[in-house]
Design a protein with these regions (language model features):
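Sec-dependent N-terminal signal peptides
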Residues: 4-14
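Short glycine/proline- and aromatic-enriched beta-strand/turn motifs that initiate or cap beta-hairpins
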Residues: 20-57, 111, 132-134, 204-207
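Membrane-embedded beta-strand positions of outer-membrane beta-barrel proteins
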Residues: 28-30, 67-71, 98, 114-116, ...
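Transmembrane beta-strands of outer-membrane beta-barrel pores
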Residues: 32-36, 56, 73-77, 104, ...
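Extracellular/periplasm-exposed beta-strand and loop segments of Gram-negative cell-envelope proteins
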Residues: 37-43, 76-92, 123-160, 164
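Transmembrane beta-barrel domains of outer membrane proteins
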Residues: 53-57, 99-103, 166-170, 204-206
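Repeated loop/turn-to-beta-strand initiation elements of outer-membrane beta-barrel proteins
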Residues: 59-65, 110, 173-179
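Outer-membrane beta-barrel "beta-signal"
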Residues: 195-207
Length: 207
């Protein structure tokens, strides 16, 4: 955890340095995830994301066009719920989305925006947790609780890549509320066909 905090501090320092040099607009964002795997049989699971973000206007392309970037700690995963057992995947990622966007100002205090582009993610830590019951002829009903690391050779892959889409509103050029969706393009477990899917509701603040 200490290494992760140091990494986020370095990322924030880097963004602040770029901001000072090139006039980037930067701030913080956080929100709720609803994630699952792409194949049948998996249920959505609630998680979160939190981190820093930056926007860079690109007037050389067109007025209103901008580059949207972020560095987020994101809890994704999925769950399987049966009558007698359940299994939860709780992977934490360092996620870096890099999107091209367009922002249209209705007036000085209100704007709408949308952006689209790739994201890159590296698995940091997390657990797979299994709970359930076994029926034994002698002992009767036995409760089972077990967990294992979510990333590894027999578990989820650490690296993920995909595409994301986001739309939202901005108030007073400082506050944002947005909804987005990420489509993972890589199998998150070897040869499984499972890919990450994630619906996000976010709020942001620019310093």
């Amino acid at each position: 955890m200490k290494k992760i905090l140091v990494l986020f501090a370095l990322l924030m320092t880097g963004v602040m340095g770029i901001h000072a040099q090139e006039g980037l607009k930067w701030g913080a964002m956080a929100g709720v995830n609803s994630s699952k795997f792409s194949t049948d049989g998996f249920d959505s699971k609630v998680g979160f994301h939190v981190g820093i973000k930056a926007e860079k206007d690109l007037p050389q392309i067109a007025q209103g066009v901008y580059l949207d970037m972020a560095a987020l700690l994101s809890l994704k995963g999925t769950q399987i719920n049966g009558n007698d057992a359940s299994l939860k995947f709780n992977p934490y990622y360092l996620e870096i989305p890099i999107h091209m966007g367009y922002k249209y100002a209705i007036n000085d205090n209100f704007a709408i925006f949308g952006n689209f582009g790739p994201y890159f993610a590296v698995g940091l830590f997390g657990k797979m947790k299994a709970t359930g019951y076994l029926i034994d002829e002698v002992e009767g009903l036995t409760s089972i609780h077990d967990s294992a690391k979510v990333f590894g050779s027999n578990a989820m892959k650490r690296f993920d890549f995909g595409l994301g889409l986001k739309a939202g509103v901005e108030f007073f050029q400082k506050y944002q509320v947005s909804i987005g969706y990420d489509w993972g393009l890589l199998d998150n477990i070897e040869d499984s066909g499972n890919k990450n899917r994630n619906l996000m509701l976010s709020v942001g603040y620019f310093f």
